[in-house]
Amino acid sequence: MEFRDQVLDLLTEVAETNVIKENPDVELFEEGIIDSFQTVGLLLEIQNKLDIEVSIMDFDRDEWATPNKIVAVLEELR
């Protein structure tokens, strides 16, 4: 499975919605798809499933605003 697909699957699981795969440019926070609790869960899942450690201090809502942006950030970190 491609890295992008892994990230989108993980986001879909955390957000509990398929809109992420249907529209990877959707604004996750503005649209209320992911909240602060889910953000923490997302960072833990990224560490557990993708073996990429992201501190909550490194998390920037603007840089992580859409699924496509999250894929790009994680590509740089891997």
Swiss-Prot record:
GO BP term (any one): lipoteichoic acid biosynthetic process
Organism phylogeny: Bacteria, Bacillati, Bacillota, Bacilli, Bacillales
Pathway where this protein functions: Cell wall biogenesis; lipoteichoic acid biosynthesis
Keyword Transcription regulation belongs to the record: no
Location of this chain's protein in the cell: Cytoplasm
Protein family membership: Belongs to the DltC family.
Pfam families (alphabetical): PP-binding (PF00550)
Protein name: D-alanyl carrier protein
The organism's place on the tree of life at top rank: Bacteria
UniProt GO molecular function: D-alanyl carrier activity
Transmembrane segments: none
Function: Carrier protein involved in the D-alanylation of lipoteichoic acid (LTA). The loading of thioester-linked D-alanine onto DltC is catalyzed by D-alanine--D-alanyl carrier protein ligase DltA. The DltC-carried D-alanyl group is further transferred to cell membrane phosphatidylglycerol (PG) by forming an ester bond, probably catalyzed by DltD. D-alanylation of LTA plays an important role in modulating the properties of the cell wall in Gram-positive bacteria, influencing the net charge of the cell wall.
